[in-house]
Amino acid sequence: MSSQDFVAEKVWLAESLRCDETDVSQQLIAGDASPRKFYRVTVVTQDRTTTHILMVSPPTENNEKFVLVHGFLTAADICVPRLKRADLDLGFFLLEDLGDLTFWMALQTGDPDAFYSAALRALCDIQALDVPPSILSIYDDAELQRELDVCPDWFFAKALSMTADGQGEAVFKRFSECLLSMAAEQPFGFVHRDYHSRNLMVREEHDVAIIDFQDAIVGPITYDVVSLLKDVYIVWPRARQLSWLKAYWQLLVNVGRLSTHSWPDFLRWYDMMGLQRHVKILGVFSRLWLRDQKPAYMQDIPVVIDYIREACSLYGEEYSAVADFWQWFEQTALPRAQRADWYTGL
């Protein structure tokens, strides 16, 4: 941060919090996959000490949408950090301080069943919302395909230095069409887009608060539950995933989002949606490394590939496009990945 930026933030914070600039201190606590930065702001006066979160977000980061979605979720009584003040021109957002306990951290010592139950209840509450068309765009075929194409553009071509060939392109095209058809079968609703262990904060008991929702969209009903249960940052055995997934499916049935006979379809949608998400992540993590100088994400590529391997093995017999993709991937891309410095295996 430049000294000029630091001064601008200090002035804005003092004005927002109605205190002197000398009362305010700030400490960087997090950055994420985007250019946004988060600071814990401490205000010390004669009467008391308070803390807040300052989000500094460039104009490229959907700032208007952040405010719009925040207002929508708040009005629906969904637990998100309180937005105390926002300046879209400066890219400054003053938020409630929810503490340091992320969902991921809580899982290291707490009861996973209790935490996942809370996260899935919150997700069901979101899925029950009626989203006005004016607020969110649709996760249509074009957007899903654009995400999938990040994989050949950044993972295959750049991270693995693979040369495009007609056979590989044809296999990927058929595979993509199969995944898009599975997405189109599903009921659509609010999609957070990154509903995972790093974007949930744990509050009192097992209550969870949701952050990082500015990329929300209207899309397939299984997208967010895949993000949570097939999390890149914490891996659970499939039996445990399915136990939580079945409980979530029952919640959706109870609120009328799904029929009582929809479990087999829901399970298939879940796994196939996971394929779309994880193939996309191969490209996204490669782009973060090569374009944005954030190489740490590459250490999670083996986990992503293992999720892809598992789903392809489950559905390869039913969908030839899935079997063909894994055969091609295993023969061409996987050996290159396993030789890379960032690949540690599982």
Locations of regions flagged by a protein language model:
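An alpha-helical support segment within catalytic cores of ATP-dependent transferases
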Residues: 9-10, 14-17, 131-137, 143, ...
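Conserved N-terminal boundary motif of the eukaryotic protein kinase catalytic domain
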Residues: 22-27
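ATP-binding pocket architecture of kinase catalytic cores
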Residues: 30, 34, 39-150, 156-160, ...
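Active-site acidic catalytic loop and adjacent metal/ATP-binding pocket
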Residues: 35-42, 54, 126, 176-225, ...
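Secondary-structure capping and boundary motifs in well-ordered enzyme cores
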Residues: 115, 143, 187, 192, ...
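Active-site activation/catalytic loop segments of kinase-like enzymes and analogous catalytic loops
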Residues: 150-159, 221-258, 272-292, 304-312
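Histidine/acidic-rich helix-loop-helix segments that form or flank divalent-metal centers
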Residues: 259-268
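ATP/Mg2+ or Mg2+-diphosphate-binding catalytic cores
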Residues: 283-346
